[in-house]
Curated annotation (Swiss-Prot):
HAMAP family: Sigma70_SigI. A motif (Polymerase core binding) lies at residues 71-84. InterPro entries: RNA_pol_sigma-I, RNA_pol_sigma_r2. Belongs to the sigma-70 factor family. SigI subfamily. This is RNA polymerase sigma factor SigI2. Induction: Up-regulated in the presence of cellulose. Sigma factors are initiation factors that promote the attachment of RNA polymerase to specific initiation sites and are then released. This sigma factor is involved in regulation of cellulosomal genes via an external polysaccharide-sensing mechanism. The lineage of its organism: Bacteria, Bacillati, Bacillota, Clostridia, Eubacteriales. GO terms for molecular function: DNA binding; sigma factor activity. It comes from Acetivibrio thermocellus (strain ATCC 27405 / DSM 1237 / JCM 9322 / NBRC 103400 / NCIMB 10682 / NRRL B-4536 / VPI 7372). Keywords: Cytoplasm, DNA-binding, Sigma factor, Transcription, Transcription regulation. Interacts with RsgI2. GO terms for cellular component: cytoplasm. GO terms for biological process: DNA-templated transcription initiation.
């Protein structure tokens, strides 16, 4: 039997072979008990996988991690705890791959926040081979993360949503706004739609952007919506359906761009 709290067990989580299924099932069982309110088990689980958190943070930042004094470690620890609460076995079969992405996302947010004040570490630490998470806003079907079970499963669900709107991933990549500020603005518009239950419901029901209602809420040019319809819909579907892993393919926290002014009507 594999000890779920042992370093050996932890290493086994990176494998997707059948022999690791019992380990993964055991982890899911632990996560479910923690989410059901077992605080002692949560503490034990986090303490047992602190070495995993340290290694993940170190690999992502390219820095030595001092547990006592590292802000990055604190971010990683909080992200691991967040991953426990947000893990959905229906979407993500492997917890540790999911938690790695959550840690990466939170370190990314931390780096962006601190870059406003000082150079904490270069963004290249977060690049994935030839594709940067910061520079590539639209979906890239060829990147390595899509080979994992979790991202593949989420992409499958996402593609079905897109098909309902007559959109393919290939078409989406071609339609993504080229200008940085335009992309940023479209993402903000998409978030407004996704965060508004009435707007998002109408989007899914009519298979189109509710322009009339949206223009009453925001002071934006109608042509901006029309020119970027495909990208705005695609982004709204990610936000509205809580596709957490796919959010890493959208630079949703990118600073700059046009600020959306709310209508006072």
């Amino acid at each position: 039997m594999i000890d779920l709290f042992s370093p050996k067990g932890k290493k086994d989580t990176v494998s997707t072979t059948n022999k690791d299924k019992s380990f993964e099932d055991g982890i899911v069982n632990i996560i479910n008990k923690i989410k059901a309110g077992d605080k002692l088990l949560r503490e034990e689980f986090i303490n047992s996988y602190t070495p995993y958190i340290i290694r993940t943070v170190s690999n992502l930042t390219g820095k030595y991690v001092d547990v006592e004094n590292s802000d990055e470690f604190s971010v990683g620890l909080a992200a691991f705890n967040e991953a426990i609460d947000s893990f959905d076995e229906g979407k993500n079969m492997f917890f540790f791959k999911f938690s790695t992405l959550v840690i990466k996302r939170r370190l990314t947010d931390y780096a962006r926040h601190n870059k406003k004040h000082c150079h904490v570490y270069p963004f290249t630490y977060f690049e994935d081979k030839n594709n940067s998470y910061f520079e590539q806003i639209h979906l890239k079907s060829e990147i390595d993360l899509q080979n994992t079970y979790e991202i593949s499963r989420e992409i499958e669900l996402y593609e079905q949503k897109l098909r309902d709107f007559g959109i393919s991933l290939e078409h989406l990549a071609k339609c993504a706004p080229k200008h940085k500020d335009s992309k940023s603005l479209c993402i903000k518009i998409a978030k407004v739609i996704a965060d508004n239950k009435e707007l998002f419901s109408k989007l899914e029901r009519t298979r189109n952007i509710p322009k009339t209602e949206l223009l009453k809420l925001l002071k934006i040019n109608k042509k901006t919506i029309e020119r970027n319809r495909t990208f705005i819909i695609a982004a709204a579907l990610i936000f509205g359906n809580d596709f957490n892993l796919l959010k890493d393919f959208l630079d949703i926290s990118e600073p700059g761009g046009d600020n959306i002014e709310r209508s006072t009507k």
